């Protein structure tokens, strides 16, 4: 009935426009939208497109997670501090607050999100607000709200104001029936977590908005991301970050995945660079909306062996979490990212040896071992 009522408004509005000839006809069905707060059927849509010489005005949602602050730093070096606005619903630490513009942004508040985009003349939006795999399974209702309803709000605002939109996807978008070694860009996807389901929804909705409304939607399927200066956010690949904190603290680590569980991984600087590169890529070079990207693939035992080359006394034990193990076994072991490398020149810098050396150096482990020896 809601759709029929809105369709009636469209028909009536068309008739009135023909009769009066006083304004340009707007086709409101184009942006009926998917969010709870639908865009009015008689809305006029404005372009915030910028000249080639003008840097983009950037908004990052969910900016206090594992990737947001690092991405903001990278983009501010590229486009200027004042052109990149970090946002979240949490209070930022002092060093983040003073590093550049920060605003409160609740992606479930459609009106507020719209105001931020308009008031700050946003032309690029990086949507990082999401509950990750393990946390999402413990909070399915909240994950559904944040990962799906929040996405709908972002899609509608981006489409209305002609904003180039990036939303990350994940290895979690694949499922146990997907090819695992390797997983191509296009294959069957039947994930068994709310996080994975929401990311498949993201990929398909973004592609739909691209073809239906012309939204410049871009998406990368991230592998497990390893970062030195941020805490893991509740994902199944978190062990690959936690192991370095443990090595620095006491030289031992208890892993919640089995020793031979192979998953694709990437160092954070490669991840952030790939994100910027795909956003800057000319539209004509992109053959698809969602790309796999990858750098390396390893097991917990292989990571521990690489770590022992720097800290020979490091010890790893295993206490497997059945939930996380089941999730990991449903994910690809290797991602095929040949399309990203071919279309827009993706190339990673960090393999496992470089990753381990960088992480240990950040935590001071390599320095301490060198002094002891």
From Swiss-Prot:
- Sites binding NAD(+) sit at 62-67, 88-90, 106-107, 195, 199, 225
The record's annotation in SUPFAM superfamilies points to:
NAD(P)-binding Rossmann-fold domains (SSF51735)
Please provide the record's keywords in A-Z order. Mitochondrion, NAD, Oxidoreductase, Transit peptide
- Active site residues according to the UniProt entry: 195 (proton donor/acceptor)
Primary location class: mitochondrion
Result, substituting residue 237 to A: Decreased L-threonine 3-dehydrogenase activity
Record Pfam families = Epimerase (PF01370)
Compartments, as annotated in UniProt: Mitochondrion
Quaternary structure and interacting proteins, as annotated: Homodimer.
Q: What is this protein called?
A: L-threonine 3-dehydrogenase, mitochondrial
Q: Which organism is it from?
A: Mus musculus
């Amino acid at each position: 009935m809601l759709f029929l009522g809105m369709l009636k408004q469209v028909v009536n509005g068309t008739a009135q426009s023909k009769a009066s000839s006083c304004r340009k006809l707007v086709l409101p069905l184009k942006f009926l939208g998917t969010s709870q707060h639908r865009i009015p059927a008689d809305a006029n849509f404005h372009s915030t497109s910028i000249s080639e010489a003008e840097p983009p005005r950037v908004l990052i949602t969910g900016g206090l997670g594992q990737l947001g602050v690092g991405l903001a730093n990278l983009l501010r070096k590229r486009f200027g501090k004042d052109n990149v606005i970090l946002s979240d619903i949490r209070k930022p630490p002092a060093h983040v607050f003073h590093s550049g513009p920060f605003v409160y942004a609740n992606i479930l508040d459609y009106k507020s999100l719209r105001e931020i985009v308009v008031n700050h003349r946003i032309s690029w939006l990086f949507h990082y607000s999401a509950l990750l795999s393990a946390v999402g399974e413990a909070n399915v209702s909240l994950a559904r709200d944040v990962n799906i309803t929040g996405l709908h709000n972002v899609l509608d605002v981006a489409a209305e104001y002609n904003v180039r939109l990036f939303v990350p996807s994940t290895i979690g978008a694949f499922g146990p029936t997907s090819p695992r070694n390797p997983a191509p860009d296009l294959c069957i996807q039947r994930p068994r977590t709310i996080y994975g389901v929401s990311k498949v929804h993201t990929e398909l909705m973004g592609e739909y908005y691209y073809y239906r409304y012309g939204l410049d939607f871009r998406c990368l399927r991230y592998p497990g991301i390893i970062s030195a200066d941020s805490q893991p956010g509740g994902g199944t690949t978190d062990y690959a970050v936690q192991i370095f904190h443990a090595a620095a603290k006491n030289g031992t680590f208890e892993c919640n995945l089995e020793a031979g569980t192979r998953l694709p991984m990437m160092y954070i600087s490669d991840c952030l660079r790939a994100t910027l590169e795909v956003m800057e890529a000319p539209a004509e070079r992109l053959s698809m909306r969602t790309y796999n990207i990858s750098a390396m693939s390893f097991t917990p035992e292989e990571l521990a062996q690489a770590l022992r080359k720097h800290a020979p006394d490091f010890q790893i034990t295993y206490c497997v979490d059945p939930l996380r193990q089941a999730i990991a076994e449903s994910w690809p072991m290797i991602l095929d990212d040949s399309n990203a490398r071919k279309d827009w020149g993706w190339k990673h810098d960090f393999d496992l040896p470089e990753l381990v050396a960088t992480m240990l150096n950040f935590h001071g482990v390599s320095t301490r071992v060198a002094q002891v020896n």
